[in-house]
Amino acid sequence: MIVINMFSSANKVAGQGVGAVYTELMGLLKHDFANEFQINVNRYTRSDISHYHTIDPKFYLSTFSKKRGRKIGFVHFVPSTLDASLKLPRVARWTLDRYTLAFYKRMDELVVVNPNFIPKLEAYGINPDKVTYIPNFVSQRTFHPVSREKRQALRHANGFKPDDFVVFGAGQVQDRKGVGDFIKLAQQNPDYRFVWAGGFSFGRITEGYERLKKAVANAPANLNFTGIMPRETMIDYYNMADLFLLPSFEELFPMSVLEAFATDTPVMVRDLELYQQIITPYTITAVDVADMQARIRALADDRELLATYAAKSH
């Protein structure tokens, strides 16, 4: 039996995709490969494979041990992706960038969830031959469609009328997630209901924290910011929604889109190059907020078109 030591603190910070990715992978290994792999978590005993999901300093130090076996690192971000996420003092940011790359360079193999990251890593001096693209995934044991009756019951319990057009979005409240555009769309469509699940996972160091906090506090009446929500509850919101909208300006391979797909919910995203190889064929794409507005209106007025995209998401 192959011994794998998983190293992760992904679930210490609630409401971020890294934790969802880790949870799904652990569920898959334990459910489908229990007789092939012995999985240890944050143990420093000898292993055949050490799989690093987060870049904690103590994990970095462990890479110098001969007990680690083959070292595999999960690339959830590169320095450039932090620009629109975190606001740090210049020295702290310089240190974090260099530490991140040093961690990745300690690995024997790296896993990326989007093939667009391979040339970015190469630009940072990492050999692309040791980088493998493995897409994220979501178990349909966790996320799945519900019956029409249960959907209506969920909508009633959460204050939605049967004929409400509900637009759902999810993710950390950050500029890069397009939260500002989500708010603007809610303002432009007072006859529709909008819900955003997610909060400030990194608190005050979130880029644009004060401005975004004020925007959330003054959201229009038809927009509800739920705050950080457990994944077990998220399935209800996907199933209540008529449309899942993720207006992000920058992503890797968003778990929220896969969760929406798993519940047969139509998905709209911003038209980004990084999506083209992974999810674009199955989504409604929009170039900007005006395009999103037009497409939302078209979908709300044409249930057959909405059903077409629901079928694509499956």
Q: Where in this protein do the model-derived segments appear?
A:
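Conserved acidic donor-binding segment of nucleotide-sugar-dependent glycosyltransferases
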Residues: 269, 280-291, 297-304
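Nucleotide-activated donor-binding/catalytic signature segment of Leloir-type glycosyltransferases, i.e.
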Residues: 208-232
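Membrane-proximal helix-turn-helix segments that form the acceptor-binding/catalytic region
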Residues: 91-110, 213
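Short hydrophobic beta-strand element within catalytic cores of glycosyltransferases
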Residues: 262, 266-269
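Glycosyltransferase donor-sugar binding loop
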Residues: 193-210, 227
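Short alpha-helical donor nucleotide-sugar binding micro-motif in glycosyltransferases
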Residues: 228, 236-241
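Conserved donor-binding/catalytic core segment of Leloir-type glycosyltransferases
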Residues: 161-177, 183-187, 195
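Aromatic "clamp/platform" in nucleotide-sugar-dependent glycosyltransferases that forms part
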Residues: 249
